[in-house]
Design a protein with these regions (language model features):
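Short, conserved phosphate-binding/catalytic loop or strand-edge motifs used
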Residues: 1-6
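A domain-level signal for the structural core that forms small-molecule/cofactor-binding pockets
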Residues: 11
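Glycine-rich anion/phosphate-binding loop at the beta-strand->alpha-helix junction
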Residues: 14, 19-159
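Short, well-ordered amphipathic alpha-helical segments that serve as non-catalytic structural scaffolds
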Residues: 25-27, 170-173
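Short beta-alpha connecting loops at secondary-structure transitions
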Residues: 151-155, 171-176
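Conserved small/polar residues in nucleotide/adenosyl-binding loops
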Residues: 179-181
Length: 181
């Protein structure tokens, strides 16, 4: 049994059709070279580990509650809940569902494949052998600091993003110049 993996830079496109065409061409060439061998399949993986996107935030305690002291208590609970979601897959499922609500809305609004993105992110949450929460929360000084890293293969050109009027409008509202590559 042999698996051959390719890494294709599709730039700002999602590139599924292009990648599958490349893989089919490679499979045909392999069939020519090794006619006695069976090729089970030649298809892309939606587990986009080479397309990681990160977001971070800093929230002052006073923004979390009626005052700084209550905000600090809330920050500590958020941090503890995030740590617990790393240990317990039942908590992680609900923790990540909340994250996915926002991600899937943006993915759908821009005409991207919500199922592909969702599958990739959930696989990433289980990459260490246990399904875990996707966020990291820490207390730094008088702030709650959060970080999220997920595989996010989405398109800003091609496919539905350029055909569907609502997807085009959604992309126009985003300031894509803020993206750091």
């Amino acid at each position: 049994s042999l698996s051959i993996d390719f890494l294709v830079d599709v730039k700002d496109a999602m590139g599924a059709n292009m990648i599958n065409s490349i893989l089919e061409s490679v499979a045909n060439k392999l069939r020519e070279w090794f006619p006695e061998e069976e090729i089970l399949f030649s298809i892309l993986s939606n587990f986009a580990t080479e397309s990681l996107a990160s977001a971070c935030c800093e929230i002052p305690f006073e923004r979390l509650g009626r005052n700084k002291e209550i905000g600090e208590q809330i920050a500590k609970k958020i941090q503890q809940a995030g740590e617990y979601a790393k240990l317990d897959p039942y908590r992680a499922a609900t923790h990540n569902k909340g994250i996915m609500n926002g991600i899937e809305a943006a993915v759908a609004a821009t005409g991207n494949d919500t199922r592909a993105v969702s599958a990739s992110i959930h696989a990433y949450a289980a990459r260490n052998g246990l399904y875990q929460g996707l966020t990291d929360w820490q207390i730094k000084g008088d702030k709650l600091v959060g970080k999220l890293t997920v595989p996010l293969a989405v398109a800003t050109v091609g496919g539905a993003s350029n055909i569907l009027p609502k997807a085009k409008a959604s992309l126009a509202m985003l300031d894509l110049s803020l993206i750091h590559i």
